[in-house]
A protein has these predicted regions:
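Accessory beta-strand-rich segments of carbohydrate-active enzymes
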Residues: 2-4, 8-10, 14-16, 20, ...
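An acidic-aromatic loop/edge-strand motif
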Residues: 83-86, 91-112, 161-163, 171-236, ...
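Accessory carbohydrate-binding/adhesion or oligomerization-edge regions at the termini
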Residues: 1-101, 185, 257, 536, ...
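Extended substrate-binding grooves/exosites of carbohydrate-active enzymes
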Residues: 1-38, 155, 194, 305-619, ...
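Beta-strand/loop-rich accessory regions of lumenal/periplasmic or secreted enzymes
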Residues: 85-86, 93-95, 143, 188, ...
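Intrinsically disordered, low-complexity Pro/Gly/Ser/Thr-rich segments with frequent PxxP/GP/PP motifs
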Residues: 265-279, 644-674
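Catalytic cores of secreted or luminal carbohydrate-active enzymes
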Residues: 196-220, 565-621, 625-635, 641-645, ...
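Extended acidic/polar, glycine-enriched regions
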Residues: 175-179, 241-319, 677-716
């Protein structure tokens, strides 16, 4: 009798034993009615409650638990599918490059930890369902991480590795009447774990669906469908290859929108290939995901119906032409994102509801491609991408970044796996084959990927050769060849991670033999994605650059409760696990938890839009970047807003052919009355889609112009009251008090109510973003934080009791101007000046000036910070919106009037950091529920300003590693600034904000704005 030998788990050549051959993911039904209901009686769901035992290592696992005489019915219960770490056993561990056992056990590639390597033992007692009795019986584990051994009634059935493709076994030989005992043992780390070092949380267990299944007398075990148009695209070949158990006949029907295109019958016997010609096929693309319905009815030799196989078919031609990747003859641009399969509730077991939400948000924001980083996803996503229209790079389960990193440190590349090692080759080919066989019939998949960040070598080259041979209708991708050029033909395209735009240009200038893609770019960690437009603009000017995939879609965070029982989004290290890479798991353009789009998505949507509207005061140039659809399938709307309020609307009929442009006169005349006007041209869905309702905006452009008005002078004057310690200024409804002693604006009363909670101060700091932390901004700019916190009107060089700088007071005919000079504790010492000019109507023009000190360089921000009572919790602004904007991330924003709560401006980044800023603000106000508060206006000479209203200061945010660590809210903190530096985002481990988005400190800096009570 065959037995299981645990010692083989650390052998890279032992990765399958008794496992069924991989096959396509088609579903088969007993008849047409079942197919219509999508409920197959050939399957029996094994999801649910299993008996469970947890052990820290194999030595602690219960021996011979699989035997029928060993009763496991008093074991713990566990849900399946689920990671055991999400069910209270072991803990989730997040690690990026480093292997999770590093520093705990000294092992080498192929070896496995012995001291701590959790073993999950599962038992399921069951009786074979009546309709399955007497038939061949199989079991499918759609995903078990990372190795699974299986027994039935004490008999060893088999063993399988590859955490991300199905492991299926035949049980027929060992099944019996009455109660059966199915036992499985899942090992967290096996030899193959050296090739599963992806940047994610480390889990284990049976985490995807499990089901029993039977097959009819005649059964199509594997199905390959190819629907490829010829070069003219006027006809296509439909080729179907079947691998059948038993003999019989198949009736094949291909239809489109209810009309039959093909109806035919063919004999079935073993492996068969059938082909038909389809005239004028309707082609599939992400822009217009047209699918045909294929139905295969399988009959035995007696003419009895055995099974019905429904399958969606997309006709499309993807190929390399003259060194350019083309889809249906057109140069394709990937407007993509990397997507880890992740849920804050259940780890890598993602529900259909969560998945559909992801895909809808992607489509709504013009994302047209997914890279399944860095493993095959559960099957449903491929079906939905076919339906929704999303291109896919399907990636093999391979990443050995840790071994490569060790080799980089030691310069000993023999440490790398799989590299050129023959003992790893079969495992690599098996993983490639398992993915290919399961997913091969999905139109959405354009490219097979050999894996991620595993250096290079012969083994990966052989994987690419397998894909090329198995599937000449798709291309093959692998980024790692850029680090090891020995096997440069591994990848059909040049793929790199996080190169600058200049680096891409330089590379293509030297070598344009292949098209170039960024398999990862614009690292979206925290407040990021600055200057993303430079990459997307490059796709318009450099034909060989064909787009990229943002890193990545969703924050990998897990619901956890703090010590007071309040849920928060936990990241690496929050479960007590070490080693870890902490919050590096949070790189999404969507939040963990509820999966909502983060503020970064606004910029992604604009940069990825397929229609460009270049608007002027009286016309619009419409550039249609779509490859296949005319702009006439969208409603085009034109609005004119005066000072933020829409005053006119119109529709515009457009009919711009794909990859063409047209200029249209606007249906609304240019305005002549004084004011600022925003002309917006936008495109919207005419009809409902599976991913959005009619009316959803897919693209826009905006043009701003002004009609000047004569300036109005303030007729009222002010009364000035001077004393030793204070300078008072009084008007009709307000009173201002400037403190000589405390060095600043101590009071601003409006309508009898004190408005400010603390003296406003110059501010040069922001709470560091994740990108700032990665490029050591705190070390480089730290003096500006100290300057912001400890500047003083007193000269610290004269001791703590030295005299303060007396403010300068300038009394004019109707105004008074008070100016403070602040010394800043920088090296060398520097100073700034803050002046307040008070007008008779309560307006206070505030001006901050700074004469740059060369040694100090640029600063994060240049503005003034205010504290108000937290009752002022409402914000309204006329500027860019609706989400936060920054100097290098504002192209996707529209000028308008927006409103929200102060708390809403705290973006839900996993680590508190700079957020909520508003660019190009003309005016903004913070008010209480009665409408009382403070109005801030730009100064006409300075132009629009940056505005921020948050519940916390930058220093409070910087001190918190989680949102729950932030203090109770006591204030509304307003920052008004000339600007702040951009957020950057080329990467999060050193790349700095681009030069043009830094604050210039090469000449005198000055910033003015006005505030007034409401």
């Amino acid at each position: 009798m065959k037995t299981f030998d645990y010692s083989l788990v650390k052998d890279p050549q032992y990765f399958k034993d008794g496992r069924m051959d991989a096959h396509s993911d088609h579903t088969y039904y007993r008849d047409g009615e079942e197919a219509k209901e999508k409920e197959t009686s050939f399957r029996y769901d094994f999801n649910g409650i299993w008996k469970f035992h947890y052990a820290r290592n194999y030595g602690s696992a219960i021996p011979e638990f699989e035997k029928t005489e060993y009763c496991c019915k008093d074991w713990d219960d566990i849900r399946v599918p689920a990671h055991i770490q999400m069910e209270g056993y072991d803990v989730p561990q997040y690690a990026n490059v480093q292997y999770p056992w590093e520093g705990h056990e000294d092992i080498h590639p192929g070896e496995i930890p012995e001291h701590f390597n959790p073993v999950a033992s599962y038992v399921k007692y069951f009786e074979v369902p009546e309709e399955m009795q007497g038939k061949r019986l199989f079991i499918s584990f759609q995903g078990a991480e990372s190795g699974i051994a299986l027994w039935l009634n004490g008999h060893f059935v088999g063993y399988s590795e590859d955490s991300f493709t199905p492991s299926e076994f035949e049980l027929t030989e060992y099944v019996k009447e009455g109660e059966n005992k199915l036992a499985a043992q899942v090992f967290k780390w096996t030899a193959s774990s050296w090739c599963e070092d992806q940047d994610f949380f480390r889990f284990s267990g049976i985490y995807r669906d499990v089901y029993l299944y039977t097959v009819p007398e005649v059964h199509v075990y594997d199905l390959q469908i190819r629907a490829i148009p010829d070069e003219t695209l006027s006809a296509a070949a439909l080729e179907i290859r079947t691998n059948t158990w038993g003999k019989g006949e198949v009736k094949i029907t291909l239809s489109k929108d209810g009309e039959t295109v093909i109806e035919d019958k063919k004999a079935l016997d073993g492996e068969e290939i059938y082909s038909w010609k389809v005239e004028d096929p309707v082609l599939w693309s992400a822009e217009d995901p047209q699918l045909y319905d294929l139905t295969m009815e399988i009959y035995n030799e007696s003419g009895e119906l055995q099974e019905v196989i429904p399958q969606k078919v997309g006709f499309r031609r993807f190929e390399m032409k003259d060194g350019i990747m083309t889809l249906n003859g057109k140069r394709i641009v990937f407007k993509g994102v990397n997507r880890h399969e992740f849920s804050s509730v259940s780890g890598r077991h993602v529900s259909e509801e969560e998945l559909r939400k992801d895909l809808k948000i992607m489509k709504q924001n013009n994302i047209n491609a997914i890279r399944t980083c860095h493993y095959p996803d559960a099957s449903l996503i491929y079906q939905l991408c076919d339906e929704y229209g999303i291109y896919m790079i399907d990636e093999t389960n391979l990443e050995s970044h840790g071994s490569w990193d060790i080799a980089e440190f030691t310069k000993d590349y023999t440490y790398v796996v799989p590299h050129d090692k023959p003992e790893w080759l079969d495992m690599m080919l098996d993983r490639a084959n398992s993915m290919y066989q399961r997913d091969k019939n999905h139109a959405a998949i354009l490219i097979w990927s050999c894996g991620n960040e595993s250096f290079g070598g012969k083994d990966i080259f052989e994987m690419s050769q397998f894909f090329h041979k198995a599937d000449p209708t798709r291309l093959v991708h692998y980024e790692g060849v850029c680090h090891d050029r020995r096997y440069n033909d591994t990848s059909d395209m040049e793929s790199q991670m996080y190169p600058s735009v200049e680096a891409i240009k330089e590379f293509l200038a030297k070598d344009d033999s292949k098209p170039f893609v960024c398999c990862e770019y614009t690292h979206a960690m925290g407040n990021s994605c600055g200057a993303m437009h430079k990459y997307t603009d490059l796709t318009d000017t450099e034909p060989k650059y064909q787009g990229g995939f943002i890193w990545d879609y969703i924050d990998q965070s897990i619901y956890k409760k703090d010590r007071y029982g309040k849920e928060f989004q936990a990241y690496g290290g929050d479960f007590g696990e070490r080693p870890t890479d902490y919050n590096f798991s949070g790189n999404g353009i969507a939040y963990g938890g509820n999966r909502d789009a983060s503020p970064k998505m606004q910029e992604v949507k604009f940069n990825y839009q397929n229609i460009t509207a270049e608007v002027s005061a009286d016309s619009v140039k419409v550039i249609n970047k779509n490859l296949f659809v005319n702009t006439d399938i969208f409603d085009c709307k034109v609005t004119v807003a005066k000072d933020g309020k829409v005053i006119r609307k119109a529709s515009l009929a457009t009919a711009v052919a794909p990859l063409s442009e047209e200029v249209y006169a606007l249906p609304l005349a240019k305005e002549e009355k004084p004011g600022e006007y925003a002309v917006t041209v936008s495109f919207h869905l005419k009809e409902d889609k599976v991913w959005a309702e009619a009316g959803h905006e897919v693209a826009f452009g905006q043009y701003i112009y002004k009609v000047e008005a004569p300036k109005k002078a303030c007729p009222e004057g002010v009364e000035v009251i001077r004393s030793t310690h204070n300078i008072g200024v009084r008007g009709a409804h307000f009173e201002v008090l400037f403190s000589v002693l405390n060095g600043g604006l101590a009071s601003y009363k409006y309508a009898g109510k004190e408005m400010i909670e603390a003296i406003p101060k110059p501010n040069f700091w922001r709470a560091p973003t994740d990108n700032d932390c990665g490029n050591l901004m705190g070390m480089r700019y730290g003096q500006w934080k100290i300057a912001s916190m400890y500047l003083s009107h007193k000269d610290f060089r004269k001791g703590p009791y030295g005299p303060g700088n007396v403010p300068e007071v300038e009394v004019n005919e109707k105004t008074v101007k008070v100016t403070y000079t602040y010394l800043m504790p920088t090296t060398p010492t520097s100073e700034c000046r803050l002046s307040y000019e008070v007008f008779g109507d309560g307006r206070v023009k505030t001006t901050l000036t700074y004469d740059p000190v060369k040694e100090l360089g640029d600063m994060p921000e240049f503005g003034v910070i205010f504290k108000f009572n937290a009752d002022y919790d409402r914000v309204e602004w006329y500027g860019l919106g609706e989400t936060e904007t920054y100097s290098d991330r504002k192209k996707g924003a529209k000028l308008g009037i927006y409103a929200n709560k102060v708390a809403d401006n705290m973006a839900r980044y996993m680590v508190p950091q700079e957020c909520g800023a508003k660019e190009e603000v003309r005016w903004a106000k913070v008010t209480d529920r009665k409408g009382r508060g403070m109005l801030f206006e730009m100064d006409e000479h300075n132009g629009p300003m940056m505005f921020s209203a948050l519940p916390y200061t930058p220093h409070e945010m910087e001190n918190a590693m989680h949102p729950y660590e932030l203090p109770e809210v006591h204030y509304t903190v307003v920052r008004v600034a000339k600007d702040q530096m951009g957020v950057g985002g080329d990467d999060s481990w050193g790349a700095r904000t681009h030069e043009e988005y830094l604050l210039k400190t090469d000449k005198k800096m000055e910033f003015s704005f006005v505030f007034k009570g409401l």
